[in-house]
Structure formats: C-alpha cells, structure tokens
C-alpha cells in the first residue's frame, strides 16, 4: 500500500512516516515546508534505510496534487498538512480557512478523481477548549471555539 502523508516533514508527520515505513508501507511525503524543514527527509531515510519520495508542494495546488497522485499511484492519505497556531489563526483567519478548509477540500477532490477512498485526518485538541476531563477522549464535550478549532471540528 502506498500512502501519501501530507505535512510529512513536520514533527508528527515525520514520525508517522518512520512508523509507516518500518511497518512495511510505501510512503510519499508532501509538505510546503512552512512549518518544517526539508532536512527531515534524509533523517527519516537514515532511520528507516528507505528512500522517501518528497514533494515540496501545497495542498491548495491542485495541479501538483494531480501530478503526485498520477505519478505515485497513491492508495491512501494521512492528512497532517495545515496551519496550526491558535494565536495566528485569530490574526489571520482567512489564511487559516483557505489553507485548512479549501486545501483539504482540494485534496479530497483529487483523491476522489483518482479513486482514493481512504483518509486519516489529524484534527486538533483545540476543539475541546478547556477539557472537562483528562486524558481527553473523543467522548469529551467540545469546548469554546477558536478559529483553529472550528476548522478541525
């Protein structure tokens, strides 16, 4: 199975890539590097001993996504790409909505066109506001909403 990890050069994404490769999956990474460094890719390759196809691209770039899905024959997606700073999401709400919502919709549309039906979407603990209990589970009631948490609900 060939899995595309969006945001795969970020902290959580790169660790997920390592785990997937060590579990025997073929992994392709897409990241625009706005919150990550390309230096992560050789480090992942050193840990796993496997080459990682890397694309510096944005999830808003439909043409780039089409090319990646066509070239790499993607079977599933793990979606970590997105802007994530709560404070900045208040200062730049449009940028966050465009990137996190429109970008995700673009990704899902390209998946649909290529017959890819499996996606794991990484949400955010911000949807719980001040949690009613810890550790947080999916049953925890949703809390006060910020721009960032609204995007992830």
Task: Give the residues covered by each predicted segment.
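N-terminal Rossmann-like NAD(P)+-binding domain of SDR-like oxidoreductases, especially those catalyzing
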Residues: 1-151
């Amino acid at each position: 199975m060939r899995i595309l990890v969006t945001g795969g050069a970020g902290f959580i994404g790169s660790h997920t890539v390592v785990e997937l490769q060590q579990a025997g999956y073929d992994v392709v990474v897409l990241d625009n590097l706005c919150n990550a460094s390309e230096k992560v890719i050789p480090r992942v390759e050193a840990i796993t001993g496997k080459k990682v196809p890397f694309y510096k691209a944005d999830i808003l770039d439909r043409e780039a996504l089409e090319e990646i899905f066509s070239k790499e024959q993607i079977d599933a997606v793990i979606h970590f790409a997105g802007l994530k700073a709560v404070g900045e999401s208040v200062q730049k709400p449009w940028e966050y909505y465009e990137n996190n919502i429109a970008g995700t919709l673009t990704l899902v549309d390209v998946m649909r066109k290529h017959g890819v039906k499996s996606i794991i979407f990484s949400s955010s603990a911000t949807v719980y506001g001040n949690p009613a209990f810890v550790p947080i589970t999916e049953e925890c009631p949703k809390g006060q909403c910020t721009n960032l948490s609204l995007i992830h609900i």
